[in-house]
Amino acid sequence: MNDTSRTTAVCEPGCSNGVTRRAQAPVGTSFKHEHLSSILADGLKDGFFEVHAENYMGAGGPPHRALAAIREAYPISLHGVCMSIGGPGALDLTHLSRFRDLVTRYEPVLVSEHLAWSSHGGTFFNDLLPLPYTKATLEHVCEHISQVQDAIKRPLLLENPSTYVAFASSTLSETEFIRAVVQHTGCGLLLDLNNVFVSATNHGFSAEAYLEGLPLEQVGEIHLAGHSEQRDDENELLLIDSHDCAISDPVWHLYRDLVARIGPTPTLIEWDSKLPAWPVLRAQALSARHITAEEDVSLAEEVSHAG
């Protein structure tokens, strides 16, 4: 069986920033039931598939039969969207228990959640909402991540958000906040490059400068996705993290630069609505694989020269 943990860690010759470069990292896509038969017929060799945990919290039925069929052939990544890691209230223990049970049942190679909140006072929101970056929020987030990691008995990967508003009360930058969370909890980072580009465009900061501020040595997975364009009330460009189209050229550029810096890393193509035919989604994954393969060759040459 394939295993996304089968990577070779190699210290980059002459590297002074402590970043570890990795070879032979797999590329995967979101798993959608509409694609099941096509995947089983012509899937992704040495790839993996990611599922949203909340779609599988029932005991059985068609969702689990489909997921079991995929799990027989491929590793899976379990991606939570409703844990409300960033909320000020206590975690929903029933939800956490179901999340833990999925980890036990399917043994995913990667487990992740969002730096966001989606519930408060018994009310649940169908969105991933931003949070103020303060010391008080940092304490809540670290406590929640530690609670999740204790439950699943493994490190969690935390995904950077896409945002459309910022809080005036924030006393830390987003990258400072994420770095502190990683330092205090030992969690890893799921680096969503489309989120970086969306937020950078919406708030007017440099995506490259943002990446410089992150603990890149802790990146355990990369997400790539498409976004849509809208106009706000002042007719300014507003990007929406819509996951309903192909990956944009600027995001591919960020990906190529990131892989050149940290080495090939497990990469997931997200496409959640306006689903294309499987060959279209598969082609996006193969494009990412081509970039990582180029870096594999570069890394092998560096290791050979270093020897």
UniProtKB/Swiss-Prot annotation:
Record Pfam families: MbnB_TglH_ChrH
Family: Belongs to the UPF0276 family.
The protein's name: UPF0276 protein Bphyt_5128
